């Protein structure tokens, strides 16, 4: 599919806005619930800063994940989906990790093929 106007998301939003909105709400609810659980566990494990606002961070994460799929902002010719995901996760994690979390992240990055 080339361009946003031919994408299934665009077509759904244009022709079936109520269904699109309901699907987006379900996606948001599912994803933020999962992210909140992960953030809470990360704080408990002292990998994420205890001062983070878990609700806010989960919403920012969702918004970023939706945003990196915008082909107008991130053309596929310039940004591969894998590169976008990797860069976004690195950006997100560096904003919330503790010193111990950073050590773990750095060791993961070094061992990644």
Residue ranges with predicted function:
Residues 43, 47-90, 99-113:
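Hydrophobic/aromatic-rich alpha-helical bundle segments in the mid-to-C-terminal region
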Residues 38, 91-95:
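C-terminal alpha-helix
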């Amino acid at each position: 599919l080339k361009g946003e106007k031919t994408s299934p998301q665009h077509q759904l939003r244009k022709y079936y806005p109520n269904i699109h909105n309901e699907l987006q709400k379900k996606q948001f609810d599912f994803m933020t619930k999962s992210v909140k659980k992960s953030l809470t566990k990360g704080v408990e494990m002292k990998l994420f800063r205890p001062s983070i606002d878990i609700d806010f961070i989960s919403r920012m994460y969702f918004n970023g994940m939706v945003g990196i799929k915008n082909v107008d902002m991130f053309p596929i010719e310039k940004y591969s989906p894998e590169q976008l995901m990797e860069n976004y996760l690195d950006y997100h994690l560096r904003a919330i990790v503790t010193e111990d979390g950073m050590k773990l992240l750095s060791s993961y990055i070094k061992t990644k093929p």
